Amino acid sequence: KMELALKGSFFDNRIIAEISLYKNYEKNLLTYLPVTQEMGYEYKLASGMDISNQGLELNLSASILKNTPLKWDLSFNASYNKNKLEKLPENQKTTVIGDHKLQVGQSVDAFWVYQNKGIYTNDSEVPVMNGKPLNINGVPFKAGDPVWTDVDGNNQINDNDRVLTGHAIPPYTG
């Protein structure tokens, strides 16, 4: 864990500026990992997840009117933050917990979603590979179902077909 901060005041403390740089590495955090159906439950709790977090924060404040009956202070804040999943337990590279996907090397607040290309209007539109129609969890698609992109081309829609579309936490705020 590291933080470096500089603070300065100018013009008899009428303007105050502060900048902070930080870097943090959390080790052995708990997360859920999927287990086989034979276990009788969906997930187990495991330690060993590592996350890095780094960023910058800038604060500026000014006393526009200080020694008058009317006081006027102005403040400004801006920040940048980036987090990254460094490691998952049991040397896994990806895990899915409910509808949330965690992938090593990506941000923990990433949105991984299926790409929708429309709706099948009839059964003949559903792609067929080796005599089997495209499916999700073994259930074949039919007319009226959404058209999801089969990213990995294995004729099954699963967690490997989710694509990164954005993040829940904006990198810049202010």
Please give the residue ranges for each predicted region.
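Outer/extracellular conduits and scaffolds centered on Gram-negative outer-membrane beta-barrels
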Residues: 1-174
